[in-house]
Curated annotation (Swiss-Prot):
The keyword Secreted applies. It comes from Huso dauricus (Kaluga sturgeon). This is Glucagon-1. Glucagon plays a key role in glucose metabolism and homeostasis. Regulates blood glucose by increasing gluconeogenesis and decreasing glycolysis. Keywords: Hormone, Secreted.
Length: 37
């Protein structure tokens, strides 16, 4: 039971981490596109 809770928390943590990385990637892409123009 506690193992399931841990896995659930861990997957939530991974999702948040992925979302933050995605936002950073978007920001980097935006600045690169603006720098090119």
């Amino acid at each position: 039971h506690s193992q399931g809770m841990f896995t659930n928390d861990y997957s939530k943590y991974l999702e948040e981490k992925r979302a933050k990385e995605f936002v950073e990637w978007l920001k980097n892409g935006e600045s690169k596109r603006q720098g090119m123009s």
